[in-house]
């Protein structure tokens, strides 16, 4: 029987564990304390967890022993907040074995380094295991998946072999895993879309309507593609499941934590108050700060990101920021804003179109 270790008793970690265990694979969920492990094992569910009729499936178990959790595992899934990735993978690193896949299921960028989670993992594990690193990302709202609704995701790695191996471990009847070898693009799509989800929440909170929100999402996707390409991603990845797919799901659903934060900001609540009231992390808040600094350092114009940054960190009024963004001076939709990557989509005429033979 295949075994998967999940580090992170987060909603997303438990959701992934549930999907994998329902397929008949052994899942060991690592809890940081004996008390947490004992409580989860006894109740077979987290407290205040939705849906209310949810319980751990038969093959999902909990332990406070990291050695036990990792022993014999084919893959370790890191389902922790992005700012906690480094200390957690550092704990696991000495216990990893040569053939064990190490998969990030976190969607964020590290504050201070601007590194993607696969880069953080690579920093902390032996170089001998670097070919085993992969990431999971896509339009994956945890509550829908826990209800058994169909969903798809993307497993990305530097090689198709590693991506396929990881995809096979997580694929289930209602959870299909596609593969991709653009690990940079898949990670950035999942991380940067949270910024736009904050903006979509602001638009919804202000009742700006679908026209304005669709414009925001579309311009946001352009910014994601621009920054992503500048960082080495394939721009086409952002038109796929880990880009556009994840963006649509997160920007249009009330289940999204980042969308929730955006809505609450329009009610006059402070960011600290909103974050303190939440049981889970809204990754877009920290990712906005990282992306804003990246854009400045690379001389990229990202007005959507900049305006959301000002709302979060400079106390800008959400309504004024949104109106300012919508009233921005129009220019060519795809070019003219230092986004040289879009030149690659322009068709070059190397010869005249041949004339048709009238005969």
Curated annotation (Swiss-Prot):
Location in or out of the cell: Cytoplasm
Gene giving rise to this polypeptide: gpsA
GO molecular function per UniProt: glycerol-3-phosphate dehydrogenase [NAD(P)+] activity; NAD binding
GO annotations of cellular component type: cytosol
Entry-linked SUPFAM superfamilies: 6-phosphogluconate dehydrogenase C-terminal domain-like, NAD(P)-binding Rossmann-fold domains
Pathway in which the depicted protein is active: Membrane lipid metabolism; glycerophospholipid metabolism
Protein name, entry field: Glycerol-3-phosphate dehydrogenase [NAD(P)+]
Domain of life: Bacteria
Family from the record: Belongs to the NAD-dependent glycerol-3-phosphate dehydrogenase family.
Record-listed sn-glycerol 3-phosphate binding positions: 107, 138, 193, 246, 256-258
EC number, UniProt record: 1.1.1.94
